[in-house]
Curated annotation (Swiss-Prot):
rRNA-binding as UniProt keyword: no
Principal location listed in the UniProt entry: cytoplasm
Species of origin: Vibrio vulnificus (strain YJ016)
Name assigned to this protein: Putative pre-16S rRNA nuclease
Database matches in InterPro entries: RNaseH-like_sf, YqgF, YqgF/RNaseH-like_dom, YqgF/RNaseH-like_dom_sf
Source species taxonomy: Bacteria, Pseudomonadati, Pseudomonadota, Gammaproteobacteria, Vibrionales
Length: 140
């Protein structure tokens, strides 16, 4: 049985999301949720989770280039993951998101130039990259 996985790219102002199927290992961007100092509108996230009914949530874990925690944002991303798990009673995994934003900007620019580089687009594409990277890690 293939699982549906939803991923989040946590940020203090915007949280990107993506959805994917384990059987295909591919992901598609969904929505960027505005956040107020890292706190999203939980009702909007709940609506999306009810609509897509994922079996698992993956949250990008921000680290530096060497995989070390970043002082301010890493603990907040972990807290967001804990809140997702507590609110929605779904399993949540953290996944390294190193360079996902850089890669997202590059992919979006190649598809649509500067116009494609809106904050929401970048955050959702980052969530796609996080999820596809998570799929790759599962398959070794």
């Amino acid at each position: 049985m293939s699982r549906t996985i939803m991923a989040f790219d946590f940020g203090t102002k915007s949280i990107g999301s993506a959805i994917g199927q384990e059987i295909t290992g591919t992901a598609s961007p969904l929505k960027a949720f505005k956040a107020n100092d890292g706190i999203p509108n939980w009702d909007e996230i709940e609506k999306q989770i009810k609509e897509w009914q994922p079996n698992l949530l993956v949250v990008g874990l921000p680290t530096d280039l060497h995989g070390k925690a970043l002082e301010t944002i890493t603990p907040r991303a972990k807290k967001f993951a804990q809140r997702l798990q507590g609110r929605f009673a779904l399993p949540v995994e953290l996944h390294d998101e190193r360079l996902s934003t850089t890669e997202a900007r590059s992919e979006l620019f190649s598809m649509g130039g500067y116009k494609a580089l809106s904050k929401g687009n970048v955050d959702c594409q980052s969530a796609v990259i996080i999820l596809e990277s998570w799929f790759e890690a599962q398959w070794g």
